[in-house]
Amino acid sequence: MWLLLAGNVLLVCAADATPIGCRRVPNFGKLYHVKGELSLPHSEIKEPFEAWYDLEGNRSRIDYRNGKVRTYLIGNDLDYGVIYTITPVNTATEIQAIKCFQLNGTQEGPIRPQAALPDLQGFEFEKMENYEGVLCEVWKNVTQVGHKKNTYRLWVTRPATPHRFEMVGFNTLLESHNDKYTIDYSDFSPQTESDIFIPSGGMTCEEFPDPVEEHQILANPIQDYVNTSPVSHAHRLFGPFKEKFNRQYESEKEHEERENYFIHSLRHVHSTNRAGLTYSLGINDFSDWSNAERARLRGGILIPDREKDTE
C-alpha cells in the first residue's frame, strides 16, 4: 500500500496500482469467452468473431463469421503444439467444401493460446471517456518501428470488461494517418466450457496450401490485430510479394505507400475469404495499387477481383 496526494485529497493506493489515480492495468484473467467485431474501414468490412481462451489449459479457439471458419490453437498437441483450422474452400471441382488444415509448431515457434484481447503491457491510463453511453477507462500505448507509428487504445470498465480496441497508424515519412482498424467487444465472461476446445471429429487435416508465407495468417487471423507492433506478419509478406512480381520502387516514400496499399489489400482478401463465399480472392499484380488506380484501370468502377492468382 502507498499514498498519493491528488490536489487536497490523500488517496490510499494498492501496492499493484499504477501511479495515475491509483488505477491498476486491467487484467482479463487466464480464462474467458468474448465476442467481437473487427472493422476494417479501408475495405468497409465488418467481421464478427467469437473467442474462447484458456491460458492454463494451453489452448484457445476463435471462430470467424459466425463459425464459418474455426481455429483451434492447442499447445499440448504433438511436441510443440498444433493449430487446426476448419474452413470452407473453393477448388476447381468443389464450392465451399469444408476442409481441415493443420499447422504444427516448432521448437523455435511453439504454438501458444491466442488471446482475442491485447496484451496491456506498456499501456498507460489516458482518460475517462463515454463509449456508447458507458463511462470507460481509456488505456493507451504508442509504438514505433522505422516510419510506422501506431497508437493503440482500449476502452474498458471495471471489473475488467473490454468494450473497444482501436489502432490508428501514422507514417512519419508520408506524414499521414494511413491505417486504422477497430474491434468492438461484447458478451465478455471470465469462464468457458472445456469441451469447446475439441475440434470436430471425423475430419482428416492436411497441410495448408501454398503460398507458404501466408500460412500463419490463414491459421491465426487475429494475431496481427491484437498484437501491438507496427510491423506485423502481414508487413513481412510484402518482401515475398515484391520478389514475385519484380517490384522496384523509385523512392523510399513510394515504397512506404505501396506497402500500405498491399497491407490493406491483404486484409481485404483474407477477411473476404473467411466469409465462405462462392468465390475466393487472392493477392495479384495489382495488390500494391491504390483504390483510385484500380478504379482508373476499370474505367472508374471499383469491382472486387474475384479471380484468385494462381501463378
Regions found by a protein language model. Give the residues of each.
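Generic short beta-strand segments
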Residues: 35-41, 65-67, 140-144, 168-169
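N-terminal leader/targeting segments and the immediate start of mature chains
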Residues: 2-59, 91-99, 128, 201-219
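An acidic-aromatic
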Residues: 48-113, 162-182
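Long non-globular sequence segments
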Residues: 66, 87-92, 97, 143-151, ...
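Extended beta-strand-rich segments in extracellular/periplasmic secretory proteins, especially
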Residues: 24, 29, 83, 96-173, ...
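Amphipathic hydrophobic-ligand
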Residues: 45, 72, 147-148
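A positional/structural detector of protein chain ends, strongest at the extreme C-terminus
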Residues: 1-3, 310-311
